[in-house]
């Protein structure tokens, strides 16, 4: 029933090992020496303190080089999410985006840049990594919602002409763009068809990063299948796919739990391929050597919850609740109206 890392962590914490290195609270004992600390201990419960253990303990594997139960957890998550590799990140998707872009983009590389991108992508792609942006214009719909990228921005001739303004030589290359960064789902809920994005611009890019901070559930809902970059059938001429997800936003995770999915095995042997060693060097640049194991365990458990038919039923139930809530609002409310089409399947 339990996934690999959480299973080992829960058994380990029950053993009650003494820790002579760190954390200094020693399984919560230090907190118990003061009324404020005792109140905190009793509020959170003993297991959260017993699960906060030193990263030097070999029983749970190394989270930085990905071995043991830690590696098993990420391998399991990759299987659940249809990725080639998955990396658990414990300081948010701002960090996940920084890891990806640091691994992919070098100074002077051209980056196709969605104007809806999160600030972390601006900071990592354009400042830290010194990429050169070709901005993809975005729009708002009549309701003021943050919409998608304007259609003309997916035209190859237009993109090459914009790239030529920045770097005339790269604009002529078969793949002028090292990376495209697309917000798969905007803050207001506009979601792309990932297949269409890849069909339109994939042949121009080495990699596409889909920032999925506000989504991540699309591949578990049949009607949203085409929105999932991780369900694409990729060939050697396709771009590598990278997906970052804020598990704490729409799935089961503590705040700051995030993950990176890497789907690029179809690029192996090509010059543009980024291997695990290079990618993990970027990962370690942003990872702490003192990880909080309950965060890692939450990512592990989240993958278990999404797995198989049980996970799909959770999302089917969620969709049903959303539909019924809209019906109730339409029937009972005068001042509130959900944003739905006036006609669905020919019915008003």
Language-model regions: role of each:
Residues 1-50:
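N-terminal glycine-rich, Lys/His-bearing helix-loop that initiates the first secondary-structure elements
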Residues 5, 91-106, 112-333:
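Conserved PLP-enzyme active-site core in the AAT-like
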Residues 36-42, 85-88, 162:
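Short acidic/polar alpha-helix capping motifs at helix-coil junctions
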Residues 29-32, 46-51, 55-58, 190-191, ...:
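Short N-terminal helix-initiation segments at or just after the protein's N-terminus
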Residues 84-86, 108-111:
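Short active-site oxyanion
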Residues 34-51, 221-239, 339-348:
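Charged, glycine/proline-rich intrinsically disordered loops and linkers
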Residues 46-95:
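Conserved N-terminal alpha-helix of the aminotransferase class I/II PLP-enzyme fold
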Residues 324-348:
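Hard-cation-handling environments
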């Amino acid at each position: 029933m339990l996934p690999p890392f959480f299973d080992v962590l829960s058994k380990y914490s029950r053993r009650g090992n003494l820790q002579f290195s760190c954390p200094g609270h020693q399984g919560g004992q230090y907190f118990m020496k003061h009324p404020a600390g005792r109140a905190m201990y009793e509020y959170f419960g003993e297991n959260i303190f017993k699960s906060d253990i030193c990263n030097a303990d070999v029983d749970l594997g190394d989270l930085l080089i990905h071995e043991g139960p830690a590696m098993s957890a990420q391998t399991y998550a990759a299987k659940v999410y249809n990725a080639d590799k998955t990396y658990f990140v414990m300081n948010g998707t701002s960090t996940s985006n920084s890891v990806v872009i640091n691994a992919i983009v070098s100074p002077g590389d051209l980056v196709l840049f969605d104007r809806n991108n999160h600030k972390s992508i601006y900071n990592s792609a354009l400042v830290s990594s010194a990429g050169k942006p070709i901005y993809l214009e975005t729009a708002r719909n009549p309701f003021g919602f943050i919409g998608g990228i304007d259609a003309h921005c997916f035209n190859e001739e237009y993109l090459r002409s914009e790239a030529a303004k920045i770097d005339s030589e790269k604009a002529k290359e078969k793949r002028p763009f090292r990376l495209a960064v697309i917000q798969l789902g905007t803050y207001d809920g506009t979601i792309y068809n990932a297949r269409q994005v890849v069909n339109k611009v994939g042949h121009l890019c080495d990699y596409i990063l889909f920032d999925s901070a506000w989504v991540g559930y699309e591949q578990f809902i049949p009607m949203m299948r085409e929105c999932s970059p991780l369900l694409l059938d990729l060939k050697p001429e396709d771009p590598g796919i990278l997906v970052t997800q804020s598990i704490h936003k729409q799935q089961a995770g503590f705040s700051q739990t995030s993950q990176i999915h890497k789907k690029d095995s179809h690029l192996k042997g090509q010059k543009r391929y980024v291997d695990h060693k290079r990618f993990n060097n970027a990962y370690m640049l942003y990872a702490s050597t003192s990880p909080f194991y309950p965060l890692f365990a939450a990512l592990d458990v989240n993958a278990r919850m999404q797995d198989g038919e049980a996970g799909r039923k959770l999302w089917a139930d969620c969709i049903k609740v959303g539909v019924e809530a809209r019906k109730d609002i339409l029937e009972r409310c005068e001042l509130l109206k959900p944003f739905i089409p006036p006609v669905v399947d020919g019915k008003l």
